[in-house]
UniProtKB/Swiss-Prot annotation:
Sites where the protein binds ATP: 11-18
GO molecular function: ATP binding; tRNA dimethylallyltransferase activity
Site feature Interaction with substrate tRNA, where: 102, 128
Encoding gene, per UniProt annotation: miaA
Pfam families: IPPT
Keyword Ligase found: no
Source organism: Latilactobacillus sakei subsp. sakei (strain 23K) (Lactobacillus sakei subsp. sakei)
Function statement: Catalyzes the transfer of a dimethylallyl group onto the adenine at position 37 in tRNAs that read codons beginning with uridine, leading to the formation of N6-(dimethylallyl)adenosine (i(6)A).
Lineage, broadest ranks: Bacteria, Bacillati, Bacillota, Bacilli, Lactobacillales
Full protein name: tRNA dimethylallyltransferase
UniProt-listed Enzyme Commission number(s): 2.5.1.75
Gene3D superfamilies in alphabetical order: 1.10.20.140, P-loop containing nucleotide triphosphate hydrolases
Family recorded in the similarity comment: Belongs to the IPP transferase family.
């Protein structure tokens, strides 16, 4: 059976994913599925760099604003809804474009990972809650060492600061009995062309810093306060970068400048982790639209046409 064709656009913040996705969607009758774990939440717009209503009017967008802040939206939910959307979009003879940077979500969709049923998702959530409670009482290093005892190979590849990934590795082992490091990706579910956008590290970091300043000017602090006031009932949604860093400021424990600097630092670290994950986990074709826009845009268009004709 012939596989459905999809294009995936990945990369850290500030490298041109949105602009490229809109251009490709216009040229190829595409519909865009957000692959970002935080953009599913209503009202979290600025901190998640959500596409604007004007941008959404250019091409159909999906999996944006589909959950309230107090709802859980898991990789299982994304996988199920994403697969259904790909089938519907393909049936309309349009091209699905997956745009975003949440590694586990993309992997679950592209490789058809077995994530279990809704009941299993509930079990995952209880295990996740257990380790998050552990983290509140212990250090990141303690959490990482708990993983290292069970799965040293996974721990060697996951930095202690990436607590979400560490907890996910612990979840996988406790749920399935299979070590996270021994999970082998299956064959790609779709006929997939993956575009990775990046630029030189100093340029990327400067763009991230500028992006954070622009978000602050656009009202990020007010949005973070809105999330802060709902943090007790929204543990998953308020963990996103761009929100949690302001909580100490709201509590009077640090200055606004320090909170903004922390957002910038965490955003830079996250971008570095994203790039490492993309290089190691999925077959990406890399381009630089920041420093080589004209040449690489032409190369992208040529490579897409070659792939479409296969």
């Amino acid at each position: 059976m012939k596989k459905e064709k999809i294009i995936v656009i990945v990369g850290p913040t500030g490298v041109g994913k949105t602009a490229l996705s809109l251009q490709v969607a216009q040229q190829l009758k595409g519909e865009i599925i957000s692959g970002d774990a935080m953009q599913v939440y209503r009202h979290l717009d600025i901190g998640t760099a959500k596409v604007t209503p004007a941008e959404q009017a250019i091409a159909p967008h999906h999996l944006i604003d589909v959950a309230d802040i107090d709802e859980r939206f898991t990789a299982f939910n994304f996988q199920q809804q994403g697969q259904q959307l790909i089938t519907k979009i393909t049936d309309r003879q349009h091209l699905p474009l997956i745009v975003g940077g949440t590694g586990l979500y993309l992997q679950a969709l592209l490789y058809d990972m077995t994530l279990g049923s809704a009941t299993d998702a509930e079990q995952d959530f209880s295990i996740r809650n257990k380790w998050q409670a552990y983290l509140e009482q212990h250090s990141e290093t303690d959490l990482w060492q708990a993983l290292a005892k069970i799965d040293p190979d996974a721990a060697a590849k996951i930095p202690a600061a990436n607590t979400r990934r560490v907890i996910r590795a612990l979840e996988v082992y406790e749920t399935t009995g299979v070590l996270f490091s021994q999970q082998k990706p299956k064959e790609l579910r779709y006929d997939t062309f993956i575009i990775g956008l990046n630029c030189e590290r100093p340029v990327l970091y400067e763009r991230i810093n500028q992006r954070v300043d622009q978000m602050v000017d656009a009202g990020l602090i007010e949005e973070a306060r809105w999330a802060y006031e709902r943090r007790a009932t929204s543990p998953q949604a308020v963990r996103g970068i761009g929100y949690k860093e302001f909580f100490p400021y709201f509590d009077g424990e640090c200055s606004l400048e320090a909170a903004i600097d922390q957002v910038k630092q965490n955003s830079r670290h996250y971008a570095k982790r994203q790039l490492t994950w993309f290089r190691n986990q999925i077959p990406v074709n890399w381009y630089n639209l920041v420093e080589h826009q004209e040449a690489d845009l032409a190369r992208i268009q040529e490579d897409i046409q070659t792939w479409l004709q296969k």
